[in-house]
């Protein structure tokens, strides 16, 4: 079983941090680096077609420095290791300040596209197994009006027609979680 609490915590924390973006919009010169450019990108994107909005957000977020999750080891009172935590999900706000790894890129794109009016029901943060990376990897899946699915990956241009190399494990948005593992 997977623990989806990190995703729901990010959704709640993002809502709490929205006031930071509003403050940047009202007082742009008080905002640091990527937060200032975020407001500019959102304003610029509002006048673009849906496809151009998606392309702009994808390029903007993918320019953010990659920062792998830190490994945190957990020990019991006797000093024996009892667990390791590797993945911490970041909000859009935290991602813009600190950078992040694949799930943070997907989450940042998700929240930016929602801000631009793309329906939550058309978006999924998807945890996959990537044959190219030989490991787990998160991407953003976006359903287009023609029902095609685009994948927004932190490592590649938008994949509009091919999803080869990705095995979907689970997907989520603010409405639900989907388990894509095969049951044998």
Q: Model-found features: residue ranges?
A:
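A structural boundary/capping signal
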Residues: 1-184
